[in-house]
Amino acid sequence: MIPTMILLFVVGYLFIALEHKTRIDKSAVALLMAGAIWTVFSLLGNDPHIQHELVDQLGDTCEILVFLIGAMTIVDLIDSYGGFNVITDHITTRNKRKLMWLLAIITFFMSAALDNMTTTIIMVMLLRRLIANKKERWIFASVIVIAANSGGAWSPIGDVTTIMLWMRGNVTAANLIANLFLPCLVSVVIPAAIASRYVADRPAAAVSAKALASGCPECIGPRLRLFILIVGVVSLLFVPVFKSLTGLPPYMGMMVSLGFMWILTEIIYDRKRSIRNMEESIQPRVSKVLKHIDMPTILFFIGILMAVGALQTGGVLTDMADWLDKNVHEVFTIAGAIGILSSVVDNVPLVAACMGMYPVADVATAAASADPAFAQSFVADGLFWHLLTYCAGVGGSLLIIGSAAGVVAMGLEKINFGWYLKRISLLALSGYLAGIAVIWLEHVLIGL
């Protein structure tokens, strides 16, 4: 049974990784893979509790999906009001090297509150108004990808993988930020410093202060755009605060935030005749935004997480964890390898697999284990979980296809895979390894 489940997962994974070759949507493959693995487990596993275990796995998966749908809706709502133009319209520098640093910093902090893909889309579209030279724009876009992935790794709501780890209790918001902010910053600073030498130190041609034309209707004034941007970002940042205050899971906080934003924008719609008179298809209302939610991505997450859940329920991941404990037994090596692997395959199933392989350890149980120092790495907010969060997020920058941000930039700017491998991958690797070194120093010197 177990070899068959593993074979199905590997074959499905190959089809997902080769989506651009097979031209079969990865969401369809993920759904089929999940159904096939659970079917094998049901027919050959002889587990009398399979119905209960299936419902448990579906419940865990749906918690993450509800959170993602809420976050995606709020971000799209901000964009529909032109809220992000408030940021892009204030970029006026003409020096290319200064511009690169400015964009990297904005991306780093923006992706901590928004998802990496949305942040990358906004910043790459901005580049088209700022940089005319195609190859120079590729360099800028590559730095944006690195900054987006690194920025998403230190925030509990910055990336799908951090959301997963945070919602399952593997990490807490405060400790995640305290442990990973500096390593993630270093992982951006080093590549950006090197990449800035690739661009000519002269003024950019035809730099436009009006950076991003999002198609936002003129009837939405700058004050309203700023108001929606502030309220939307505060609503997203409210989620970890809500969890800390109430003890309820993050998806409940996201539901509260989305409900508040929905009511607020409905009141604005009702009171502003100019918005009511807009063409119905472009009205900035949640009911319209929800129609544009990326459902294939949601279905992909369902398929992947349920497939990994089947491997966990069947004991496959436990066996893998036992093998790693016996043959590797070093958290930096394990997490570092996972990070490099995440540049080739999707980091969502990688992190989900690790969460299944290594359940959060109880402090007392870890202290009483045969190797307490190693076991302590797997308690809540332990060293392994912070390493995994960092490596899975930042490691996706090593290849252009290693992250959603990279794939988006590749599609928008037609960045060549070989060009990125030759010009950017070593830069990303230098930042990745430097960040791991910072985590090691934090652990050794101050015990973080």
Model-derived regions, located:
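Short, amphipathic, aromatic/basic-enriched membrane-interface segments that mark the entry/exit
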Residues: M1-P3, D89-N95, C216-I228
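Hydrophobic core segments of alpha-helical transmembrane domains in multi-pass membrane transport
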Residues: I6-L18, M33-S42, L68-D76, T107-F108, ...
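Transmembrane helical segments that form the transport core of multi-pass membrane transport proteins
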Residues: Y81, T88, L99, L103, ...
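Membrane-interfacial helix-loop connectors
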Residues: I37-D47, L58-G59, M110-A147, G151, ...
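Hydrophobic transmembrane alpha-helices of multi-pass solute/ion transporters
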Residues: M5-L77, V86-R94, Y251, M255-M306, ...
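Alpha-helical transmembrane segments
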Residues: G59-G70, N175-P191, T246-G259, I334, ...
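Juxtamembrane and boundary regions of transmembrane helices in multi-pass small-molecule transporters
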Residues: N133-W138, S142, W154-S155, M164-L165, ...
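Hydrophobic alpha-helical transmembrane segments
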Residues: I6, L31-L32, L65, M100-I105, ...
